[in-house]
Design a protein with these regions (language model features):
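Alpha-helical subdomain
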Residues: 64-68, 142-150
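Conserved GNAT acetyl-CoA-binding A-motif
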Residues: 92-95, 122-136
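Conserved acetyl-CoA-binding loop-helix of GNAT-fold acetyltransferases
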Residues: 93-101, 106-122, 148
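A conserved beta-strand-loop-helix scaffold within acyl/acetyltransferase catalytic domains
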Residues: 1-100
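Conserved beta-strand-loop-alpha-helix junction that forms the acyl-donor binding cleft
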Residues: 99-106, 131-142
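Low-complexity, glycine/alanine/valine/leucine- and proline-rich hydrophobic stretches
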Residues: 73-86, 113-122, 132
Length: 150
């Protein structure tokens, strides 16, 4: 997953000013950092000829769970967080971290396909809302697509 993420990320974002290409080590560090909170049902990749061409990566929104931790995140609260996420399913909202499609597949329905795949699965999931992270104003296609789903 980390390598597929890196390949799409580098093709989709590294061409923008101020964005550096991601190396393998950095991609693996990011995924390892996210691993404890990842719900695999919230990660979607699109492929063409076995090559990754897009992704939508979401995580459970931790804010409602960690609010009672009062800013402390020692071992006890880490255990409480894992229990809340993995056993009690206390996180009822999803946070969309990143969505991307490689430039050569823009305008070919990949974005809509990924959203549609998620839309079909969401009723089966224990979440009731989705918050999307920032969408750059340089990406009018994504802005229009998100506006049509809201």
């Amino acid at each position: 997953m980390a390598e597929d993420f890196r390949l799409v990320y580098n093709k989709a974002w590294a061409l923008f000013s101020g964005v550096k290409a991601m190396d393998r080590e950095q991609a693996f560090r990011i995924m390892n950092t996210l691993r404890p909170i990842i719900d695999e049902r919230l990660i979607y990749f699109a492929y063409y000829n076995d090559e990754p061409i897009g992704f939508f990566i979401m995580v459970p929104d931790l804010n409602r769970v960690i609010g009672s931790f009062n800013g402390k995140f020692g071992w006890w609260n880490k255990l409480r967080l894992m229990w809340a996420l993995k056993v009690a399913h206390k996180a009822d909202r999803i946070f969309g971290l990143i969505f991307g499609v490689t430039p050569e597949f823009h305008g070919k329905g990949i974005e809509a396909g990924i959203i549609r795949a998620f839309e079909k699965e969401v009723p089966k999931l224990p979440y009731n809302s989705l918050e999307l992270a920032w969408i750059g104003d340089f990406n009018p296609v994504m802005m229009r697509m998100m506006e049509s789903y809201v």
